[in-house]
Amino acid sequence: MRYALLALVLASKLTAADLIVPPLTEGAPQPGKRATVITAEYVGTKVHHLIALPDDWTPDWKARGKHWPVIAEYTGNYYPGSGSTGQAEGAALGYGLTRGKAIWVILPYVAKDHHQNEITWWGDIDATVSYAKTNIPRICNEFGGDAKKVILCGFSRGAIGVSFLGLHDDEVAKLWCGLWAHDHFDGATEWKGTEWGSPLARYRQEAAIRLKRLQGRPLLVTQGSGAATVRPLLAAQLSAPSWTYADVDMQALYGKFPNESVKHPHNDRWLLRDCPQTNAARDWFERVTASDKPSK
């Protein structure tokens, strides 16, 4: 009996350890699954975003007077060493944060040929930013997203992108009620060989201009590494109440790398596992999207 009870406890811990990202479907957007959407502007191409509707979403949401927060996400670069595919289908950060309680949208980086999603860096920057400007309001209108409660998050390349793309100009910056970046941040590191991220002095000047467009809205920055650069950079530019910083101890969370869950400490899967940092990030999301929060 004692061994059976122990086995039951261990099984429950394993079951509860990691959330499972909703499966992909070829059908229309629906609760509990990720659907591929090719918009009217990109019919005939492979440019697409993914969307997963909240677990309690129903087609009669308007009649029910229902609205949901929106978590929009930019993925990391193609980087096999960490398991990052660079594709929208590889995203996990936003779902781990919201757990089926929000509309989850994985935004594309529109390739320069406008025929596919880019898996390394930004593709056509203007087209990528325009895609968000067009489709975030569209998704809110079509599926009941609360336009006052849209958070943009990103991992690695996407962590840079929440500012580089999400604060690219005043129009796109107005879409978000808050930003969350995991592992990296716009202006923290020089990206040699790119036109936008080098030399460092110019890059940081441009990043500082972008960051001013946040205008006091909440920013969460989490880091599995690189805190020595990111934290001082933000502390010099932002007031303490508006931004939150947290380290994520990947070794404490996962042990050795690679393992059955992740290949590398630099990953976006940690939000699928319950831990103090996960709970803190989820609490931040709940606060930022609280029903009584003022309009942005």
Tell where the protein language model's regions lie, with residue ranges.
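Sec-dependent N-terminal signal peptides
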Residues: 3-14
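A domain-start/cap signature at the N-terminus of enzymes
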Residues: 16-68, 102, 198-199, 248, ...
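Catalytic active-site module of serine/aspartate enzymes centered on a nucleophile-bearing elbow/loop
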Residues: 267, 271-296
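The feature captures the conserved acid-bearing segment of alpha/beta-hydrolase catalytic domains
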Residues: 171-276
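Gly/Ser-rich "nucleophile elbow"/oxyanion-hole loop immediately N-terminal to the catalytic nucleophile
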Residues: 57-66, 117-157
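Active-site machinery of serine-nucleophile hydrolases
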Residues: 67-70, 74-134
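Loop/turn elements at helix/coil->beta-strand transitions in domains of secreted/extracellular proteins
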Residues: 66-70, 99-104, 146-150, 172-178, ...
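Short glycine-enriched nucleophile-adjacent loop
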Residues: 159-171
